[in-house]
């Protein structure tokens, strides 16, 4: 009998990106090692309308709550916008001190890659060629898509 253990749930959903048009555009600055343009340091959270917080809460809740993964005191921390040009990239990273994160693809298709948290052990014991032990996950998401994932990915 085969049994799967240590599964990592992620969620794909659709959002109405036109709702985000009401968010004031914060200045974009080069960030992180990649220099991708971002409002990470300049986006004032208080400028994000309550309607957006409510909309995003609803999308997250309909995914996490039905899977019994949403805590009783859930709250959003920080929202920002990254703008990618053709050859821009984002280094592998996590979102510390948070449980769940998400990416919304407003006008680009996904080039996001998630690395298996056990990648080092898998490579050490099995190499890189067993499809039963994938080393990464590259979702195929279009504009208007949202992916919700544990922040340790």
Q: Whereabouts are the PLM-identified features?
A:
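A generic structural micro-feature
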Residues: 5, 73, 94-98
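Non-heme Fe(II)/2-oxoglutarate
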Residues: 1-72, 80, 89
